[in-house]
Amino acid sequence: EISLRRLVKEALRMRPDRLIIGEVREAEALDLLLAMNSGLSSMCTLHANSAREAVIKICTLPLLAGENVSSDFVVPTVASAIDLVVHLDLDRDGRRTVREVAALSGRVENGVIETSDVFHRDHSGNLVRGAGAPSGAERFGRAGHDLAALLSSHSDNSKGAY
């Protein structure tokens, strides 16, 4: 049997431009977090009930890697390595829809990562813009994206699946 943790390490040896992990459930979260912290564009999925709970979970999973990994290391690393958390929900028709998008500011206060609401569903089910935004607009610019334009262009109050 080949563990996901080993596959993540082997993938990093290939010097990829991006690393995408289908589902993070255990100690492989540490290796993914280290890759993200080194500047490698990465994405993963995990199961949680909200964007905030996903942040808590991604802070907890690396602790499964061993006794020498502490939350004093993991929490600030998550805060600096992850920009956005997109929470999907399953609607009545079985479609996945964006429920909320949260931005991580990079700041930690009393062991809690500061997040802000970028998008959320209102009481009518419309996806609406929150007050938050991801930090590091210059990185989006270097990649050819105008962050302000991307965030302001969402005006369709979409109820659709993504």
Language model features with spans:
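Nucleotide-state-sensitive switch-loop elements of NTP-binding domains
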Residues: E1-E10
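Short Gly/charged-rich anion-binding patches and loops
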Residues: R6, L30, G132-S135
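Residue-level detector of solvent-exposed, low-hydrophobicity positions
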Residues: K9, L19, E53, P76, ...
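Conserved P-loop NTPase nucleotide-binding/switch module
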Residues: A11-E109
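NTP-binding/hydrolysis catalytic cores, primarily Walker-type P-loop NTPases
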Residues: D93-Y162
